[in-house]
């Protein structure tokens, strides 16, 4: 495992680079996750490809819950719907959703699906919305952590998602929902 240079409690376990995609079985992956849980890791996040290949099967074998990440375009929403069905069929009920690369200007012009449209189609709880942000590319190319960039809208969205996962108060005024009319109305009733 590789320890992150910025966060001492963050580790990365890279996938084996082998041509044989069946080198690790779902049973071995489940055992690895159980071992890591026993080592006192609070969260184990497994990034996996979408689809029915071995990497997906391995990832869900060791998972207690799932987060599906999608973009607001029709083909990605169809894929997300298929993945949600596969997760539920494999016992991972009530997956959460992250909507990535959302552009408010395109939503307002009805050129991109809104979070409400996506939620209506997929019928799962939205964990967070990450806006399109050029800082993502800049941070990636520099090897920086976007979550540390206090000026980045995507970085803020990542931090809000983490707060939600941790069960912390997440009433950030910069979230996408708070900037919409519906979000403003909701906020008025929630605040009192």
Across the structure, where does each feature detected by a protein language model lie?
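C-terminal boundary of histidine-terminating zinc-finger modules
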Residues: 142-157
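Short helix/strand-capping connector loops at secondary-structure junctions
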Residues: 137-146, 163, 167
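P-loop/Walker-type NTP enzyme "switch/lid" segment
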Residues: 1-38, 140-142
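A generic structural signal for short coil/turn motifs at secondary-structure boundaries
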Residues: 20-23, 105-107, 147-149
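P-loop NTP-binding site
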Residues: 125, 160-192
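Generic hydrophobic alpha-helical segments
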Residues: 28-36, 157, 161, 165, ...
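Conserved phosphate/pyrophosphate-binding and hydrolysis machinery centered on Walker-type P-loop NTPases
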Residues: 22, 26, 151, 175
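Conserved catalytic-core segment of NTP-binding enzymes
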Residues: 27, 31-39, 43, 48-141
């Amino acid at each position: 495992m590789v320890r992150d240079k910025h966060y001492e409690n963050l580790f990365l376990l890279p996938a084996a680079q082998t041509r044989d995609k069946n080198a690790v079985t779902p049973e071995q992956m489940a055992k690895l996750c159980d071992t890591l849980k026993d080592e006192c890791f609070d969260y184990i996040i497994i990034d996996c490809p979408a689809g029915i290949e071995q990497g997906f099967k391995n990832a869900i074998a060791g998972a207690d819950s799932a987060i599906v990440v999608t973009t607001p375009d029709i083909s990605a929403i169809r894929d997300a719907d298929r993945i949600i069905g596969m997760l539920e069929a494999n016992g991972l009920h009530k997956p959460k959703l992250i909507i990535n690369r959302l552009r408010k200007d395109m939503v307002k012009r009805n050129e991109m699906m809104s979070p409400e449209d996506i939620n209506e189609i997929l019928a799962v709880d939205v964990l967070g919305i990450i806006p399109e942000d050029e800082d993502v590319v800049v941070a990636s190319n520099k090897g920086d952590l976007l979550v540390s960039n206090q000026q980045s809208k995507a970085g803020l969205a990542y931090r809000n998602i983490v707060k939600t996962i941790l069960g912390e108060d997440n009433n950030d005024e910069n979230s996408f929902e708070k900037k919409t009319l519906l979000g403003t109305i909701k906020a008025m009733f929630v605040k009192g």
